UniProtKB/Swiss-Prot annotation:
One Pfam family matching this protein: Dak1
Domain DhaK: 9-336
Free-text remark on how the cofactor is bound: Manganese or cobalt are requested for FAD-AMP lyase activity.
Active site residues per record: H221
Record family assignment: Belongs to the dihydroxyacetone kinase (DAK) family.
Binding site for ATP: D401, G402, D403, C404, S446, S447, G486, T494, M495, D556, P557, G558
Domain notes: DhaK and DhaL domains have differential roles, individually DhaK is inactive and DhaL displays cyclase but not kinase activity.
Regulation: Each activity is inhibited by the substrate(s) of the other.
In-chain residues carrying the UniProt-annotated modification Phosphoserine: S511, S545
Name used for this protein in its record: Triokinase/FMN cyclase
Catalytic activity: dihydroxyacetone + ATP = dihydroxyacetone phosphate + ADP + H(+); D-glyceraldehyde + ATP = D-glyceraldehyde 3-phosphate + ADP + H(+); FAD = riboflavin cyclic-4',5'-phosphate + AMP + H(+)
Length: 578
């Protein structure tokens, strides 16, 4: 069965994709009758060398994304994973020659079809008296024994686009550019790894990988790599890649060693998330620096893809200062990243954390009866939430991402860890403030933020008094802050429903002669009833608000958790009173 693709037709997808890119970029034009994109300011290139590249489609943004001042003059696109037609290549050469350029350099990836078709077009152009040269890029570092076809052309080709473009922009001649980039290309190595295959529109995937497997050294068309291995953490993957790329017994290795200076490219092969790319980039830089390699520049993104392949390639290019200047030279090519002209290695990547405001000594005093009671309450709350983890997760799966219990359990374990550090502060306001900071840092998600808001606001009325009216006022203040920023209201099927119900009962604490436990008992029962009632509500806030009410037939997990917290508090205070 072929994979799903968003195309108009299999036959027309390459042309449609190129047309869409040109339509969105006024600096580009299509060459009438051909699948060719060119700079729209060709006339400004009179007397300068033109640079043409291309190949099969399906590797976007390569190569059209790298057309622009300081990079390519134009590209010729073949069908998906197919070499461009000789006629299209020749038409592109003629177009730039007729614009008055001082010769054309063809930058070609090392694949048989590309070499043949670009080579034939070059010979025909030369026969017409046009000055044309060709460089073939072979940067694949996968194969330890050189094959007759040579090394494949991979993402390192993009760096040659950049270097050649900068040289052409300086006004260097065709012969000299050709010689320089031919030498530079020999100091580039690329290696890929993937978790999945890719599939040409209208066809089945190019190969199969088990769920726990990945393939090392595969090509950008799904060609076989050097071996399959079990899925391991990113640090191990990157270590394996760097070891393979720099192993001197590997005929296709890149000669990077301690003391070398490199440009690093972390290239998404199509289907990785930016989250994964960031993790891989972090590992690559750490591990290179750990080997004594200076990372002069780092590029992270999608440069040469393989359709939807869930993989990454790493490219290393040995550089010196003159070569870095060419990498840093200005370009307006849409797919080239805007990089700082500063070395990655040697830069201080950590800024000192801001200092905490000084606390009044009386606010931080610990120990005493109140402190011990607060410790018992917090310990019971923590134990309760940890015990409810699976139940809350199950409730959350119907309307959220199924992690409400895990989130509350994470908060509970953080509180337990804090309690082990020593006695809690004697001041309830200080306890709530510290809990707020702890939950914001450790709990995470919207729940952490909402509890953080609630506790921060609730702490304020308790700074002056800690009697029952002050605790009722603290509840009111916390709810007000939660509503202000969370945008939830009673009846929206959130934790606020339980908290609001409890708060209404706690208003009785503001009356003269009010008792602690009778009022709190009513508050707990109201909170539990409100939590149970949420299963009949339509969600008005949070992720559940995007779910049909017909699917919401269980209580809201946040409301259940809030009610359980009140029940835990009551149980501790009842035990103390007994």
């Amino acid at each position: 069965m072929s994979s799903k693709k968003m195309v108009n037709s299999v036959e027309g997808c390459a042309g449609d994709a190129l047309a869409g890119f040109v339509a969105c970029n006024p600096d580009l034009q299509l060459l009438q009758g051909y699948r060719v994109a060119l700079r729209s300011d060709l006339d400004s290139l009179k007397g300068r060398v033109a640079l043409l590249s291309g190949g099969g489609s399906g590797h976007e943004p390569a190569h059209a994304g790298f057309i622009g001042k300081g990079m390519l003059t134009g590209v010729i696109a073949g069908a998906v994973f197919a070499s461009p037609a000789v006629g299209s290549i020749l038409a592109a050469i003629r177009a730039v020659a007729q614009a008055g350029t001082a010769g054309t350099l063809l930058i070609v990836k090392n694949y048989t079809g590309d070499r043949l078709n670009f080579g034939l077009a070059m010979e025909q152009a030369k026969a017409e008296g046009i000055s044309v040269e060709m460089v073939v890029i072979e940067d694949d570092s996968a194969f330890t024994v050189l094959k007759k076809a040579g090394r494949r052309g991979l993402c390192g080709t993009i760096l040659i686009h950049k270097v050649a473009g900068a040289l052409a922009e300086e006004g260097m001649g065709l012969e000299e550019i050709t010689k320089k980039v031919s030498v530079i290309a020999k100091a580039i190595g690329t290696l890929g790894v993937s978790l999945s295959p890719c599939s040409v529109p209208g066809t089945k995937p190019t190969f199969e990988l088990a769920a726990d497997e990945m393939e090392l050294g595969l090509g950008i068309h799904g060609e076989a790599g050097v071996r399959r291995i079990k899925l391991v953490p990113v640090d191990q993957i990157v270590t394996l890649m760097l070891d393979h790329m720099t192993d001197t017994s590997n005929i296709s290795h890149v000669p990077v060693k301690s003391g070398s200076s490199v440009v690093l490219m972390v290239n998404n092969l199509g289907g990785l998330s930016f989250l994964e790319l960031g993790i891989i980039a972090d590992a690559a830089i750490r591990l290179l620096e750990g080997r004594g390699v200076k990372v002069a520049r780092a590029l992270v993104g999608t440069f040469m893809s393989a359709l939807e392949m869930r993989g990454v390639s790493l490219t290393l290019m040995l550089v010196d200062e003159p070569l870095l200047k060419l990498i840093d030279a200005e370009t307006n090519a849409k797919a080239w990243p805007h990089m700082s002209k500063v070395s990655v290695t040697g830069r201080n990547r950590i800024r000192a954390a801001p200092t905490e405001p000084a606390e009044a000594p009386e606010a931080t005093a610990a120990g005493g009866v109140a402190s011990k009671q607060m410790t018992l309450v917090l310990d019971r709350i923590s134990t309760t939430l940890i015990g409810l983890e699976e139940h809350l997760n199950a409730l959350d799966r119907a309307a959220g991402d199924g992690d409400c219990g895990s989130t509350h359990s994470r908060a509970a374990k953080a509180i337990q860890g804090w309690l082990k550090e020593g006695p809690t502060p004697a001041s309830p306001a200080q306890v709530l403030s510290k809990l707020s900071v702890l939950l914001l840092e450790k709990m995470g998600g919207s729940s952490g933020a909402l509890y953080g808001l609630f506790l921060t606001a609730a702490a304020q009325p308790l700074k002056a008094n800690t009697d029952l009216p002050a605790w009722s006022a603290a509840m009111d203040a916390g709810l007000k802050a939660m509503q202000k920023y969370g945008k939830a209201a009673p009846g929206d099927r959130t934790m606020l429903d339980s908290l609001w119900a409890a708060a209404q009962e706690l208003q009785a604490w503001k009356s003269p002669g009010a008792s602690l436990l009778p009022v709190l008992t009513k508050a707990v029962k109201s909170a539990e009833a409100a939590a149970e009632a949420t299963k009949n509500m339509e969600a008005g806030a949070g992720r559940a608000s995007y779910i049909s009410s017909a699917q919401l037939d269980q209580p809201d997990p946040g409301a259940v958790a809030a009610a359980a917290i009140f029940r835990a508090i009551l149980e501790v205070l009842q035990t103390k009173a007994a």
